[in-house]
Amino acid sequence: MACLLPAAQTLPAGFLFLVLWASVLGDKLLVVPQDGSHWLSMKEIVEHLSERGHDIMVLVPEVNLLLGESKYYRRKIFSVTYSLEELQTRFRTFGNNHFLPGASLMGPLREYRNNMIVVDMFFSNCQSLLKDSATLSFLRENKFDALFTDPAMPCGVILAEYLNLPSVYLFRGFPCSLEHMLGQSPSPVSYVPRFYTKFSDHMTFPQRLANFIVNILENYLYYCLYSKYEIIASDLLKRDVSLPSLHQNSLWLLRYDFVFEYPRPVMPNMIFLGGINCKKKGKLTQEFEAYVNASGEHGIVVFSLGSMVSEIPEKKAMEIAEALGRIPQTVLWRYTGTRPSNLAKNTILVKWLPQNDLLGHPKTRAFITHSGSHGIYEGICNGVPMVMMPLFGDQMDNAKRMETRGAGVTLNVLEMTADDLENALKTVINNKSYKENIMRLSSLHKDRPIEPLDLAVFWVEYVMRHKGAPHLRPAAHDLTWYQYHSLDVIGFLLAIVLTVVFIVFKCCAYGCRKCFGGKGRVKKSHKSKTH
């Protein structure tokens, strides 16, 4: 140790700490991500783990959107059957289909078919990976300590079982209430609204009835989405597999915060990381700083419908542009489509914007969003009231939650007019209650003992240190469906009650025959003698 002292005197203490910390840790983590926006939060955790000295390998399809090279991790590339053009076309079609005429009329059926455009491609991706013997052999030889994945598309779940690795899931939500169904978390239909319903946790009788029916249909939806994965998992593992059985020894990192979500029962292996994507406000570039400064006392409005929507129909884009031109604020609109011909001087189109940094600026008055969870949490973190235009997935439910809390106004983007958008913007900007409500949510959200990113890193390291977290696993996983609902106990007790009732009935019947049956026969014989 003494030989290190001269060198140590010339190095910053922080650097020495990192070096020593890396030598203590250095576990090997295999990451199986989902491409697209799901990767953004996972990437933050991966980079932080890498900075703490862990050896990170990310399993990446050769054709992808966001899974690029990084100094924080190594990539293992595997081949897929689709091209970059097909990948981009599928995502673009998925986003733009929500603006088709009548998109809201078919409701769940159209949404399901539209989702399958992307889901089928992810399944093809998984199929290619699990049939790639060279990649599987490489992964076996590397002897990782844990696997980190997004279980929305369960390829990583299957791989964890194949490699016999403890797993950590990062998840936000998916149809079928996947995390609660597979995590054996109680989910009462009386006050826990189901996915796509747009209900709050205070439901009317008709809403509870609809919620009950949707809960039953979720099992069918689960089968439609995931039955194919059970086939390829059974083929790989050489035994019959049901996906629920593969989720038993896992830790769930859920991007939830009950400031935003409705309160509900949870399990001890569920850790909450809502707002993990929120960062401290950074300094704006010269370009955006100039836009903000030029807005004057009226300030700015930030407008983004996310990366999935690249083009809006011309008529709808012009309606939006007309509404934006009627407010005194400067509008920064992230939009890559054709420029509306009626775009007003106060509206600036940009292909990209530093959303969190702009939302954190004191001159920001409102946020027009598609209600994706990343954007919603950034709005909460920075205390900006919202005008929400949900398009697909959990966005309708997200918008309902914020509307219920009085922090925003929801519009149907397909049916709204320029007047509707103008009125919504003026409402959230001029009505002080919206700003007060979102600031209250922001204060509650930030009042926590540890930052979500640090909490996520702790639990991933926890699983690597202890080779899993089986002590947090609920025993519900070991029960059959009838044992879980105590139907065998109810049946046994019911049988006892029925047996006792039957015996009592028989005894009473026997007693009645003894008491009254004999007298009847005596009277009858007496009458016969008198005749």
UniProtKB/Swiss-Prot annotation:
TM ranges are 489-505
Q: What is its EC number?
A: 2.4.1.17
What's the source species' lineage?
A: Eukaryota, Metazoa, Chordata, Craniata, Vertebrata
Matches recorded under InterPro entries: UDP-glycosyltransferase, UDP_glucos_trans, UDP_glycos_trans_CS
Q: Name one GO cellular component term.
A: mitochondrial inner membrane
List the protein's name: UDP-glucuronosyltransferase 1A6
What up-regulates or down-regulates this gene? Answer: By dioxin.
| Pfam hit, one | UDPGT
How does the record say this protein sits in the membrane?
A: Single-pass membrane protein
Family statement? Belongs to the UDP-glycosyltransferase family.
> Which organism encodes this protein?
Mus musculus (Mouse)
Q: Which residues form the signal peptide?
A: 1-26
